Regions:
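Conserved N-terminal phosphate-binding loop of PLP-dependent enzymes in the Aspartate aminotransferase
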Residues: 2, 6, 15-313
Length: 313
């Protein structure tokens, strides 16, 4: 039977669907708002170019997996603030918890006047982390801060300076974590020199033709040429490579890293800042391999959109 529905031109249909049929109250109010173009012009005068933005729109409201800009256009948010919103925008439980806390106090500095929720979260993270050994958790603010503290912990525990990271890895944008990050553009360009005692091994990548055997051989060659294993404090790796191509570490690779670390007294750090908290179907991506790291760094989706990070181990 022929359709009785009149078809719209593709462009017209796309424009119509971009406008929300259920506009949130705050967008439906009869108030004057700036356009995306006006905000872009203001931004160009007030914000450094180094703070890049991908989308030429400005957010006004968000709910679950959807976002509305200041002009009322509705979008599906596939980015989730780069892995920060595994629970979606404005999850009711997250909002309720934040409001309840605001009614009590906002900050006391745990080092000055400690508070119970810090301990509550530490206990939960200790219980969730893989492995049967007792654990403790340090809480900080950002993923880069968590990674830096993991390095400090490894250096203090082993008395060694060296850190081995992998090609394509991303660990943050502070000076130390940039030194560990395995790509130049856009973060490392023209901002060196970087800290010493940071070494890089090849990441096993089918896309780049690098096998697990190649990667392990590269790591062992590094021990022979640049990084004396007795002076290496930690090997850090993302169980799922993030900015380097979203490539999972082969389980065989992870097991061999564990064996190498055990042999040389090196701490294995799993950087779960992007991959953690359910993004791979388990609390932590490294759980799929069955390998237990010495330290786990966490951030992003742990707090459902609020700045919170930690080191578990």
């Amino acid at each position: 039977m022929p359709s009785t529905v009149k078809k719209q031109p593709r462009n017209a249909a796309a424009k119509k669907s971009a406008k929300s049929s259920v506009v949130p109250d705050m967008l439906d109010a009869n108030v004057s708002v700036e356009t995306n173009a006006q905000l872009i012009a203001r931004r160009d005068l007030a914000v450094p170019r180094g703070v890049a933005s991908t989308a030429p729109i400005y957010a006004k409201y968000a709910e679950n997996a959807e976002l509305w800009d200041v002009e009322g256009n509705r979008y599906i948010d596939f980015v989730g603030s780069i892995g920060v919103l595994n629970t979606g925008h404005r999850h009711p439980k997250v909002i309720a918890a934040a409001k309840a806390q605001e009614d009590q106090y906002t900050h006391t500095s745990f080092q000055v006047v400690p508070y119970g929720p810090y301990i509550d979260l530490a206990e939960k993270l200790n219980a969730l982390a893989p492995g049967d050994t007792p654990k403790k958790t340090l809480l900080v603010t950002t993923g880069a801060e968590a990674v830096e503290n993991a390095v400090k912990i490894a250096r203090a525990a082993t008395g060694r300076p060296g850190v081995i990271a992998f090609t394509g890895g991303y660990h943050g944008r502070t000076l130390l974590t940039l030194g560990m990050t395995g790509k130049i553009s856009p973060y490392k360009k023209d901002v060196g020199p970087f800290p010493s005692d940071i070494f890089r091994a090849p990441f096993p990548s089918p896309r780049d033709g690098i096998t697990v055997e190649d990667a392990i051989t590269g790591l062992k060659n590094l021990f022979l040429t640049d990084a004396q294993p007795e002076r290496v404090a930690a090997i850090i790796i993302e169980p799922v490579l993030g900015e380097g191509g979203y490539t999972p570490v082969p389980f065989e690779m992870m097991h061999q890293l564990r064996e190498i670390c055990d042999k040389h007294g090196i701490m294995l750090i799993a950087d779960e800042v992007q991959a953690g908290f359910g993004r791979t179907g388990k609390w932590f991506a490294i759980e799929h391999s069955g390998v237990v790291p010495d330290l786990i760094t966490v951030a992003k989706s742990m707090a459902g959109g609020y700045p919170l990070a930690g080191v578990i181990g």
